[in-house]
Each structure stands twice: as C-alpha cells, then as structure tokens.
Amino acid sequence: MKKHTLFLFAALAPLTLVSCGENGNTITFAASELPHAKILNEALAPVLKEKGFDIKVTVLDWTQQNAAVARGEYDANYFQHEPYLNSYNADAGEGGALKMVVKAHFEKLCLYASNPQDKTLDNGDSIEIVNDISNIERALLLLKDNGVLSDISKNCYDKDGNFAEFDVNRPNDFVTFADDYSRCTITCIKESALAASLGDYDFGVLPGNTALKGLGDDYASRIVFGENVTEEVLSLRANGVAVRPADATNEKTKAIVEAFADQRVSSYIQKTFGESVVYHYENLLK
C-alpha cells in the first residue's frame, strides 16, 4: 500500500462549484463543503481534466451521501473516514455497501474554546462532543491523552476491542475525569450543530472540517490542543473517496485514485488549508 503524508496549513477561501454536462466523461461527486468539495473543484478537477474527465460536485449533508451513491445518484462521495464507512456498511447490508478506494486527507480533531481569550480548562467547565459512535471514542481519547479524562469505561468496548457501546444521553457515566477536572461535564450533540452550539458550552471537541466551516477565520485562535497525529491515526482516520463496489476498478475510479496522488493536489492543500488538515494518500486499489 502506497502512503504519502504531509502536514498542512490552512486559510479559508470561497467555494466554487464545477458544473458541466453529465456524460460518460463526467464524474459526479457528493461531498461535504469544506474541505472536501473545495479540494475536488480547485485541486482535483484540473488534474482529472488532463485525464479526460470533467467533474460535477454536489454539496450534501454527510448523513445523505452514502445512500445517494449506493442508489446510483453519484459516482462517488468524499467526506468520511474508514471507521464511519464500516459502520454504515454494517447497517446497509450487501446491497447498499460501498468501498473506499483512496484516502486523501486527515482532519485533526481539536479542543476549541468558546472564548478565544480564555483557553484554560477549569474544573466544572462544560465540553461538547459529537454524538455519532464512530467519532465519540476519538473525542474521548483526545481528552484522555491530554489529561482531562483519566479513564474510559471498559463497558464501551466489545469482546473484539471495538468501541461499540455508548449512551449519548448519559456520556458522563462512561468516563472518569481526572482529579483536576472532576466537576467537568460532557454533552453529546450532532456534528452539524457543534460549531453553532459552541457558545452554549465552555469548550468543544470539533473535527477540522466543522471548525473550518463553522468558526470562521479565527478558528485557529480557539484551539486549546489537538490530536497526536501518528501514522496509525492518519491511516485509520484519513478521509477518502467511496464508490459502489462494482465501480471500484472502472476508468473513472482509477482516474480519481491517480489524481489524488498528483503533487499539485498535495501542494494545493498545503497552501490552502490550516493546521487542522493533513494530506495523506493511500491507494486502496493496490
């Protein structure tokens, strides 16, 4: 498996969608707005054009994208990491399952302060995290690795060691806070509401794309700490492109996978996006 990793830096810029006639040479994508659709339109599109393909990108809510590709409404989507796709596939069954064909970038999970002038976590502060099972463990590990939590309940893990059991309505029953933060509390809410709700809490654990889109240009000034990004974490949590299994080796898919390896794509991401984004390429067709 081929891997390239490059740590990147970011600044927001306007999103421009590419539209073109839908035909055999047009690749249709469903994608999240930032950074995914922006990367597709501004970095991948010129590379794919050289390979004989135009692209059409539709920004969809992330909860709709897998089903839309499975129904054949789009050739591919670009928004998710492999653990989320695996969780979706387990529920979708064989007919609705998708296959990830390339990993392209990683979005660092960070703790953000609601008040950028006060980034000290005090005992009794409130913390919001995401409410989907594939990302809850990641948020809890971020807090544990940085000394906020001392333990995550073993009851959260199944016999194979997978994080599988967690009641989003009782998150504090599944964690133990470190002594210095014993009166802190965690609340689980929808990822789409994390940025808008940050003002209702003292701190929030937000994925990179959510912070980029929802916190504005000063998002970086709110960062308290971020994930320790190892090669293992990069590979596990890198966002990639998913297609229907039957399309995994067609010419469109091969072109997508090759295009993401182009130096111009990695350079674009490096120059365009902030410290919350990391370029990480893996060809999953090999």
Predicted feature descriptions by range:
Residues 108-119, 236-255:
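A bilobed periplasmic-binding-protein/Venus flytrap-type ligand-binding module shared by bacterial periplasmic
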Residues 97-150, 266:
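A conserved helix-loop-strand patch within extracytoplasmic ligand-binding domains
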Residues 87-101, 114-117, 200, 214-229:
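Ligand-binding "clamshell"
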Residues 33-56, 64, 74:
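Short, polar/charged alpha-helical segment
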Residues 57-67, 159-196:
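Short helix-initiation/N-cap motifs at beta->coil->alpha
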Residues 135-146, 259-281:
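Periplasmic-binding protein-like
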Residues 24-34, 53-58, 125-127:
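Short, well-ordered beta-strand elements
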Residues 15-19:
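C-terminal motif of bacterial Sec signal peptides marking the signal peptidase cleavage site
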